[in-house]
Amino acid sequence: MAAIHSKDTKPEMIVRRGLWARGFRYRLNHKRLPGHADLVLRKYRTCIFVNGCFWHGHNVTESQVQGSGFKVQGSECCKIPKTNREFWVAKIRRNKERDREEQKKLAAMGWHCITVWECELTPKKREETLEAIAFTLNHIYLQDRRCKTDDVRRERDEEPMALPMAAEEESCF
């Protein structure tokens, strides 16, 4: 498994080129955030994870079978090997659990997470996926900014505090 690259993979490069061409600027593999996201867009407070379908168990289903525990079924894009199956099932399960934990930590820190799957970047689906990412990023940006401007607007529209008056209406001398 030492030959498996975690940075600069082909799916990651497709997403990077697509976002750059659409005007989005990002940092790569930010070390200070949990999970080491593939792309970090600080302006949008968003982390993008480009996951390989096999390594992260895309659409892998686990169902409980009476007596024997769990039955794991692969998907179209994630086929679990038949040899040494228990090892691969445990590895994929750990990867999925780690991904969930990292995304929870990022959400607690106020970051948004987008997961892009390798199978979504096939030539037939590529443009649609990249447009969906761009739409989601713009939506996040507008939602975050609207919340801040709404807070400012509410503060401005609140009743002014009772200020002391320089001259009283009625005076008794």
Language-model segments: what does each one mean?
Residues 1-64, 70-115, 119-152, 156-173:
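Nucleic-acid endo/exonuclease domains
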